[in-house]
A protein has these predicted regions:
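His-Asp-centered catalytic microenvironments across diverse enzyme cores
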Residues: 42-165
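Active-site neighborhood of thiol-dependent amide/isopeptide-bond enzymes
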Residues: 1-62
Length: 165
């Protein structure tokens, strides 16, 4: 289960949306801020060709975000793309003000589709690993075990693909 622990993301200095959401939730909880792990299925129009080939789809099942309890309500935060990835993909960085949900933009800065939220899977205190594993086994055959998943060099893939644009 190492790939789905906050300490693993800290040690490896990289992760994917699910592991980054786990890290953000752990940090918030350590500071006394209630936090939950949220998941949604999203259609990603801007993923890399290499990732689409590995996944055999551009639907990202169980995309992770973090829900934080601030000022008597739950607010969504998406800790996935760093500023470098946003710049390479032509995306406006997500802003978080503590009042409004901060989820992926539907369009990039050029007006192209970026992210479509297809299905909200709910919010949990811990990652629903078995449910995630079943979905990944069904839709991503041959994908590595979800519990040991770490991010491939997505930043490198983006750099390679965007260099030719």
């Amino acid at each position: 289960m190492g790939g789905l622990k906050a300490t693993t993301v800290l040690e490896e200095k990289r992760g994917w949306c699910v592991s980054k959401a786990i890290l953000l939730a752990a940090c918030c909880r350590a500071l006394g801020i209630p936090a939950r792990l949220g998941y949604a299925d999203v259609l990603n129009h801007l993923s890399t060709e290499k990732l689409r080939q590995r996944m055999k789809t551009n639907v990202f099942y169980w995309h992770g975000y973090t829900a934080l309890y601030l000022d008597d309500r739950w607010v969504k935060a998406t800790p996935a793309f760093n500023i470098e990835l946003c710049e390479k993909f032509g995306l406006k960085p997500l802003e978080f003000n503590g009042r409004d949900d901060s989820i992926y933009h539907a369009f990039d800065q050029a007006g192209n589709r970026h992210m479509e939220y297809l299905h909200d899977r709910g919010q949990f205190l811990e990652p629903p690993i078995e449910a995630m594993r079943r979905t990944f086994d069904e839709y991503y055959p041959g994908w590595p075990d979800i519990s040991d998943a770490t991010e491939a060099d997505f930043g490198g893939e983006v750099a390679d693909e965007t260099a030719t644009r």
